[in-house]
């Protein structure tokens, strides 16, 4: 089981033949992965995946990521037939942190998230650096650098209220069918996570030398313009680094774009997705330079 686990999602992100070379003795990062060259000795690269459909239809921009992350091909568009890998990892290692996982998306739409327990329980992503900061380092954050903190009586009351419904819950579960019981279990799992969060907020955190509460990010726009998405990505990534250092979470997911890759340059109507379909291949370079 990993100590920390995270995913970055960038749909339609690599041009075949321009990301990784064919060497077998070590990873050979090419033009589109030059930024990773300094870390070549610390990275394992996996590619050329294939997703057996088991007789099910291939739903474009959906089947691929679902099958890769759940090991099961979906039957219907929008179907997520099993938990994504990060959810299983979070179940194993995320129980003793304030947040079982942190999910972020750079598109401005919280539903552009690729982590879910099932079709009906998809984890929404934080869309702005300021919202992410408020969640991680705002109300409820216990700074390891400060000692002598006292339990918040409001938090203690919230925890006691949650604990007080357990008997009613158990009686109610005995009256419903298996499908409804499964849905209720998902709901009460989230309640248990909240109870854990409240309990941790009443404890003085262990000293963490690398933990430094960051500054509040500047207010800014969200959306699908590439410069906006990049700026929000960089700001949220910096907050994420400190969230991990402060042991606020051990599992995270970052979505740079949506499954259709709808990012676009300022002042243009063509999205990245449209360019991959319609832009001509440059005969000199062998790829679509704008895409």
Q: Where on the chain are the PLM-derived regions?
A:
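Ligand-binding pockets and gating/stacking loops
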Residues: 1-291
